[in-house]
Amino acid sequence: MEHADQYSWIIPFVPLPIPILIGMGLLLFPTATKNLRRMWAFPNILLLSIVMIFSLDLSIQQINGSSIYQYVWSWTINNDFSFEFGYFIDSLTSIMSILITTVGIFVLIYSDNYMSHDEGYLRFFAYMSLFNTSMLGLVTSCNLIQIYIFWELVGMCSYLLIGFWFTRPAAANACQKAFVTNRIGDFGLLLGILGFYWITGSFEFQDLFEIFNNLIYNNEVHFLFVTLCASLLFAGAVAKSAQFPLHVWLPDAMEGPTPISALIHAATMVAAGIFLVARLLPLFIVIPYIMNLISLIGIITVLLGATLALAQNDIKRGLAYSTMSQLGYMMLALGMGSYRAALFHLITHAYSKALLFLASGSIIHSMEAIVGYSPEKSQNMVFMGGLRKHVPVTQIAFLVGTLSLCGIPPLACFWSKDEILSDSWLYSPIFAIIAWSTAGLTAFYMFRIYLLTFEGHLNVHFQKYSGKKSSSFYSIKLWGKEEQKIINRNFRLFPLLTLTMNNNEQPYTIGGKKEARITITNFGYKKAFSYPHESDNTMLFPMLILLLFTLFVGAIAIPFNQEGMHLDILSKLLTPSINLLHQNSNDFEDSYQFFKNATFSVSIACFGIFTAFLLYKPFYSSVQNLNLLNSFVKRGPKRILLDKMIYLIYDWSYNRGYIDMFYSISLTKGIRGLAELTHFFDRRVIDGITNGVGITSFFVGESVKYLGGSRISFYLLLYLVYVFIFLVISYFILF
């Protein structure tokens, strides 16, 4: 094993030649490089595949004999300070390396076709290679300073890719928003690193953990200061992993190309925050207040992400809030001390979410042929529906990813999420109730997305919409090259809750406001429309492989053993595993508890799915005059109250909980107001004092000149009087 580990330093640098060669090619041979741009995908995929094979070898050796290998080079040494640069190989490193490389390979294969017509094809692949290099460098870092360097590189690459289509104002604003939000967390991370160096005198993980534990055990450190430093470290993870209250950048990050959305949400940027907390868990675990803070932030994010996903029109934004909620589950597990469950869910969620994003990219790709190249239209579920018969392979992939995220066995996320839900009962009943309730919400909003996208009929054909520029509803805008005209931004999916087929029924009224209903009655419309088409094989192949991962990756950590069979590979890989909730366990009791909790969690998920079907499954042909909500609550005061509550919830969710608005008012406008006040104080007060002294001197001089009548004798007399007064004042002050 030692022989393989000695060459582990090469892992981050294998993909690095690609952006260097692309840059040199564009500088030296720009025409040839652009003409042969598709050739760069192959070496990119090949080099990342080499890293994947190397990571698999490391993981196998970790399973056979778990150990930690660290190698460092002295970078700067003097009498006061020494810094070492190296790599750190353990089970967490091997897991993250496999995750980054496998998801990265599938995303690169997918991107070759998805980005083939984009002018920024070469730039995209250069950024992607640098992104993978940065993330691999992060997970192999051996100290906090090295982590911070690669942490910033990961952030830089994500900003470049979020703002990839920088000519579009929305993409540029999203890039700025991600940058500013993450600056807050990164500044906290840097302060926390410096604080712990001041306490322990070391940046190296093993030395840091050992010294800090001894200081805590001997009560030789100020506990409040330690808690503050640990909170600052955690702030970096909060921003990077889009945890409340620094989550606002993640939905807007969907302005980047869909493949990068898959990579960010599955294996790179948002995973970096979870990795940081997992890496520093031996540090956090001796500070109970920090563990409570981590679990509290996690459970708030779980619930907030799920509720904000309920009424999103944009398919990618809905998936983004789903990612936020699932990251909250991972953070909750880490805060509870359930290290294994958190990493297990990180793995299963990565493959499931990568599958969902690549499938959504296939959907967007097919919709662009009808509505044009504009995210406001091609990603809008208002225009979708009935895609099941047009993109069947994509539909199957999206359905499998949806079922996995809902926690339906035997798919990947079922095993990991159920373990977190089970552990939550041991930690806090209140947290458990919230976590289990959110599992039902997850099933509801995920199937809402699925039903609005794939079931029913293609809504774009019944919206009086045309993809031509003459349309009064939208104008085609090619990535910011043209002015956007009329956009109906207030169109919401709340009316889809009440499907009515009765042409004579009046619009529905809430609180004096008329809410229009979508009524589709004439399916015999003869006008020929263009229809979506299935994506090419190079886009479908990665989706099918990820589908297999989603089906079978849960087998690496089946949480119970049969006689003679040891199926829990993940626990072997994570030996010794940190778990504060299962220090003493019995296999039979654990198996019984697992089946009991699994039955309950699947029942909650099925209830969420059933509710989504009731509200969003179209009944166009079979029940022409059925208003579904009327089957449960007849029209009257109770029905009006129910509708007001539903509208209130959907309005709150649609507007992102008004959190972005609050930040805009309190922070953005507040800072602008402070800047204007500072400018006023500087110009009117500070400059006023300076200018006032000059003006006063001028008028005093003119007054003296006028009184003296231009006689030198008077000036001398006045001068002597002033000197005498000055001497008198000085005498009384000194003596």
Swiss-Prot record:
Membrane topology according to the record: Multi-pass membrane protein
Localization: Plastid, Chloroplast thylakoid membrane
UniProt GO BP: ATP synthesis coupled electron transport; electron transport coupled proton transport
EC number: 7.1.1.-
Pfam families membership: Proton_antipo_C (PF01010), Proton_antipo_M (PF00361), Proton_antipo_N (PF00662)
Keyword set, alphabetical order: Chloroplast, Membrane, NAD, NADP, Plastid, Plastoquinone, Quinone, Thylakoid, Translocase, Transmembrane, Transmembrane helix, Transport
Any GO MF annotation of the entry: NADH dehydrogenase (ubiquinone) activity
One GO cellular component term: chloroplast thylakoid membrane
Reactions catalysed according to its record: a plastoquinone + NADH + (n+1) H(+)(in) = a plastoquinol + NAD(+) + n H(+)(out); a plastoquinone + NADPH + (n+1) H(+)(in) = a plastoquinol + NADP(+) + n H(+)(out)
InterPro entries xref list: NADH_UbQ_OxRdtase_chlpt_su5_C (IPR002128), NADHpl_OxRdtase_5_subgr (IPR018393), ND/Mrp_TM (IPR001750), NU5C-like (IPR003945), Proton_antipo_N (IPR001516)
Transmembrane segments: 9-29, 40-60, 89-109, 125-145, 147-167, 184-204, 219-239, 258-278, 280-300, 327-347, 354-374, 396-416, 425-445, 540-560, 600-620, 714-734
Main enzyme class: translocase
Subunit: NDH is composed of at least 16 different subunits, 5 of which are encoded in the nucleus.
Family: Belongs to the complex I subunit 5 family.
Task performed by this protein: NDH shuttles electrons from NAD(P)H:plastoquinone, via FMN and iron-sulfur (Fe-S) centers, to quinones in the photosynthetic chain and possibly in a chloroplast respiratory chain. The immediate electron acceptor for the enzyme in this species is believed to be plastoquinone. Couples the redox reaction to proton translocation, and thus conserves the redox energy in a proton gradient.
PANTHER family in alphabetical order: NADH-UBIQUINONE OXIDOREDUCTASE CHAIN 5
Protein's recorded name: NAD(P)H-quinone oxidoreductase subunit 5, chloroplastic
Lineage: Eukaryota, Viridiplantae, Streptophyta, Embryophyta, Tracheophyta
